[in-house]
Amino acid sequence: MIPARLHRDYKGLVLLGILLGTLWETGCTQIRYSVPEELEKGSRVGDISRDLGLEPRELAERGVRIIPRGRTQLFALNPRSGSLVTAGRIDREELCMGAIKCQLNLDILMEDKVKIYGVEVEVRDINDNAPYFRESELEIKISENAATEMRFPLPHAWDPDIGKNSLQSYELSPNTHFSLIVQNGADGSKYPELVLKRALDREEKAAHHLVLTASDGGDPVRTGTARIRVMVLDANDNAPAFAQPEYRASVPENLALGTQLLVVNATDPDEGVNAEVRYSFRYVDDKAAQVFKLDCNSGTISTIGELDHEESGFYQMEVQAMDNAGYSARAKVLITVLDVNDNAPEVVLTSLASSVPENSPRGTLIALLNVNDQDSEENGQVICFIQGNLPFKLEKSYGNYYSLVTDIVLDREQVPSYNITVTATDRGTPPLSTETHISLNVADTNDNPPVFPQASYSAYIPENNPRGVSLVSVTAHDPDCEENAQITYSLAENTIQGASLSSYVSINSDTGVLYALSSFDYEQFRDLQVKVMARDNGHPPLSSNVSLSLFVLDQNDNAPEILYPALPTDGSTGVELAPRSAEPGYLVTKVVAVDRDSGQNAWLSYRLLKASEPGLFSVGLHTGEVRTARALLDRDALKQSLVVAVQDHGQPPLSATVTLTVAVADSIPQVLADLGSLESPANSETSDLTLYLVVAVAAVSCVFLAFVILLLALRLRRWHKSRLLQASGGGLTGAPASHFVGVDGVQAFLQTYSHEVSLTTDSRKSHLIFPQPNYADMLVSQESFEKSEPLLLSGDSVFSKDSHGLIEQAPPNTDWRFSQAQRPGTSGSQNGDDTGTWPNNQFDTEMLQAMILASASEAADGSSTLGGGAGTMGLSARYGPQFTLQHVPDYRQNVYIPGSNATLTNAAGKRDGKAPAGGNGNKKKSGKKEKK
């Protein structure tokens, strides 16, 4: 039992503490001061900073201010001293007319805490007003037969002060006929009355002059006076009388002007003139005198001003009725003004935030509203609400204050601003309402990154584009605003084929337009993968990226390239072999071409552009195969020239041509045997070119022969000295020229021959045109005297088997040397023996030529007739290892067949693909031609 009892006691103490804390907090928010009226402006009322628990400097820092009420501000805050001071002269009588306690209320707002403190200031009365009479002079008529002790009302004095400073007493100037008596009303008012003490005699004195003095209880005492003149009349023995001592009326405040409220009525028993009664206000305040009017004849009270319950809800007046004899009666008139719902509620914004961040938490204060209705009772009861489905709510605060706060977290991207309508409605009939509109902007925060409308972008650009051309425009959207929506575009770093991406494309950081910095080549690369980044300027900045695929479109900017037959570098033309026994459709060769473009631009077609024998050959449109169109006849020329065109399908189409020379023969030796009688087709342009070449070479030869003759003439003087040398060379008669050529000389001669000896392709007869001789040293071989040297060429050839007219060798001329640039070899670059001499007669020249052709025939037939081993150019075994075909260029590139475009091909290189026996040539696949 004891623990349970202690628990109940403890619980009661806790509840009592909570209740006391609540009462203390409520009391702390109400501050009271007292101040006398009529203080000068700036007079101290109270230390508001101390009562708020603040330092004076904190008043401004924390936003402490007085919430204004009405147009006139009576008080102000002194930020230096922290005091509440008067803002002007305070007149208690003007503010609180007739009120016993004059109390002024004001509200002080502490903005940082959004807390309101109520302040009550009691204005104490001082004796600043003297009593006064509205009429400074008054005339009273009294019948001479008036009875003593008859009372006559005197004018009432006014004193706006209260308490002891208000009206306290009346005094009448001394006289023998009258005295003064003061009546106290129910409300504490004092009404002076004149009492007749001694009977009047008009004949003795027709008028009496009195002075009525009103005094207050202030210190010092203030007084007011009124002069009274008493006129003595003839006898009238009856006074008027009101039907009732008090008249009451309740009227609504919205009455129209001139409306009759009530009628007072008084009667006089006298007759005639003495019975006539006139009505007047005996007592009425200033406000009532401006609102009500009393008809002096009828006693009707009507309105001459607008009634306002909020200004004054009750009026009290005193009327009197007086006959001609001066007798009077009085009655009270009480008028109650009923309230009607004629005032709509008033809404005052005491604090307002123009904008609120969109990420503000729920319950953020937007505005502080003060709601008031001047009506009373239900007409003054107000309810507030927000129109529409808005994310805000009103919370009841201190007194008539409401707080407008957010109900959810706002999002500027959904709703950037709100027009809030706060409606205040009273409970009157009919109810009146007031709408207050609040415009609220939602401040943006950077909570949205830029967004691209597409997940990825693709752009196409033809190759060979000009630099600086725009490729594509990418645009991102940021739902934010201002700086948070300003987007900067950039490209992610990347490397393409070893080069930075920035060397190929760039992007405008403001517009997002992508530009080409270089001209693209489809054959180099066909697409670019670019990552575009969009970043806003918020804090912190947000970004997003998108992939951009840039495809390069092919253009027909590459002509077909012919891979086979390849164009020789030495100016010769390849020869394809077609046996005379070939049937129609026989595959002679195949033109192979490629195009570096793609698609339709790389589709190739082949056609026979020109042929020396039309109808003999055909070219496959898509394969490029050159086949015989019919059987070969004996009348068909040995050499057939074909021009094959290869064309792509681009726009515009590009093409390339190749010239093929087809030898109609069964073998290479047959081709060489028939070269002497080969006739080329007439071609005016080629014939002219050949003529020019013949004339040029003939001129050079003539100059050379003249030079040789000059040298021979100079050597006649030394003829006798050379007899011994000639005698020693007599045993060489009948020896072939090939036995006099040394290894080094042949090598140098062949190299020079390969570059400087040319055979015209279309001459009417076969000619060998030799440039200026450039011979190497010659060696004598005794071992080869016994052998004969057959020659391959016949007919009109300049070579002959019987060329033995001059077999003696002139002595070497050691003074005639050639510079390094004049020596045999390609452009004089071959190394030779600086001590050798050159043949200086026609015999040696012809023998060397015969040796070259014999060696060529030997290599073509795969056998040697000069006694040398394989690949030794027919030289003896003594010189074979030192000079082989591996040390010199392929003769098939250097020896031309006169009168044709063909070069010598290895006789062993048949279509069967077998290599010649004992040869060192390369092996070719079956069905392929060896092209040099």
From Swiss-Prot:
GO terms for biological process: cell adhesion; homophilic cell adhesion via plasma membrane adhesion molecules; nervous system development. Its main location: membrane. It is found in: Cell membrane. The keyword Transport does not apply. It holds the Pfam family Cadherin_tail. Residues 816-841 have a biased composition (Polar residues). The chain crosses the membrane at residues 693-713. Residues 30-692 are extracellular. InterPro entries: Cadherin-like_dom, Cadherin-like_sf, Cadherin_C, Cadherin_CBD, Cadherin_CS, Cadherin_N, Protocadherin/Cadherin-CA. Keywords: Calcium, Cell adhesion, Cell membrane, Glycoprotein, Membrane, Repeat, Signal, Transmembrane, Transmembrane helix. One of its GO terms (molecular function) is calcium ion binding. It is a single-pass type I membrane protein. It comes from the Eukaryota. Residues 803-841, 902-932 are annotated as: Disordered. Glycans are attached at residues 265, 419, 545. Residues 30-133, 134-242, 243-347, 348-452, 453-562, 570-683 form the Cadherin domain. The keyword Transmembrane applies. Residues 1-29 form the signal peptide. Residues 922-932 have a biased composition (Basic residues). GO terms for cellular component: cell-cell junction; plasma membrane. Residues 714-932 are cytoplasmic. Potential calcium-dependent cell-adhesion protein. May be involved in the establishment and maintenance of specific neuronal connections in the brain. This is Protocadherin gamma-A12.
